[in-house]
Amino acid sequence: MKLIENTEFGGERPLFASHDIHLDNVTIREGESAIKECSNIVATNCRFEGNYPFWHVHGFTIDNCYFAVGGRSALWYSDHLTMKNTVIDAPKMFREMNDIDIENVEINDADEIFWRCNRINIKNLKLHEGTYPFMFSKDIRIDGLESDSKYVFQYVKNAEIHNARITTKDAFWEVEDVTIYDSELNGEYLGWHSRNLRLVNCHISGEQPLCYAHGLVLENCMFDASCDRAFEYTTLNADIKGHITNIKNPTSGIIVADSIGSITLDENIKAPADCEIKTRN
């Protein structure tokens, strides 16, 4: 592997079609597509300021690097990436990618990141600002996530998430086969139109959670007092720890809680309208 260190590049495609190179303490200045159509690339202690640096790259590692605002749309149409100990201030990262491993990364403009990506493994990720992270992605495994980005995990399939703290409305809309463990989920309209969403040991806050869901499972979950009109038109099996403020027109299944503030079953309930709702003795 060729070592390139303590230098900088700018302009158009300065390292186009490079293979088997290690960039250390390199700055990519203003320009486009610095490391395009490359393979077997290692970047350590580097700074990226130009647009689209890693497009169509196959097999690469990014460690202890920084992506400035100008380094937007930096990682598209690539595969087999390992990224560690990196800070990103640029939006629209990770698009149409496969086989991504992330550890100890902070993204400060998480706008439209991780779109249409497959096989993502994440440990300790912080997301700030931006909209729609993880849209249309699948096969995701996460342990450790802090996010205040809007509308996360919409249209996601086959995900397992541990130890997350997520604050946004409209999270997990239209997801399929997603399980969330030991997490804090804050925001209105959580998990609407989901299929096979499972929450284990989670704390939920925000109004109208988990409506229009099919095959919802809750295990030992807690609800904040703000959670009114929960489970409208949802089929579910729910084990709720503590109190829930209000349950409205669930379609079918079973709900067990320690206490329930109120239950709304009115003329608008949908068939089969046979959900069993009870409190523990």
Regions found by a protein language model. Give the residues of each.
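Long, distal/terminal scaffolding or interaction modules
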Residues: M1-N281
